[in-house]
Amino acid sequence: MKLSYKLLIALALLTATNAQASLMKTQDTLAVCSNGEQATFVVSESKSNNWFVYFEGGGLAISPESYKKRKSSQKKPTTDKNYGLHYPIVKDFKKKGFNVVVIPYCTSDLHQGSHTNLVDGKKVYFHGRKIVVDIFKQLDSKFKSAGKLVFAGYSAGSIGLGFNSDLIKKYKNPKVIADSFWLDTESRKEREKWTKGPWVQINKFLFSSMPKHCKGHW
């Protein structure tokens, strides 16, 4: 009987948590996923004044061939209002009472692109930067008034933190959790030692044309 009671409580808490999550759309008409559809992101609010923002990772497209090999789900907006809330670090911050924002990765460009390319004659949007700018703009007042503000990302999302450091640094005392290399001088020295497999081409993609806003923010 006690077990059933505890299970009911757990289910009630889970339902309440999921009910608070909202699927939001970007407002800028250029803040789109690679397939050209308006990007979406997830906001799960609590009664706290603390905010946790998670940049999703998942590789990158360094050429038309590598883009075509990526899953279709990585090129379009999510329609799931609970998307990304299952990630362990996201769940952890939710348990701590933080408001949570999940930025899905649908542009294959390390959350930093602002250009288009033709792939098999079709326009493909690499507008990750535009998506991040739009989301930050929509949540700007929340971030400015946050008691604690934490940004995190994994893999491509972690590198995306570095590419968007100029946006992050605008807020008071932001904290950053990066689980892999971001693009600072020290990590670049290490990456340039990787000369086997796809790393030569990947590094060329990463470092060939660094955005001006990436310089000097850490």
Model-derived regions: residue spans:
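Hydrophobic h-region of N-terminal signal peptides that target proteins for export
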Residues: 11-19
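Glycine-rich nucleophile elbow surrounding the catalytic serine of serine-hydrolase chemistry
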Residues: 154-165
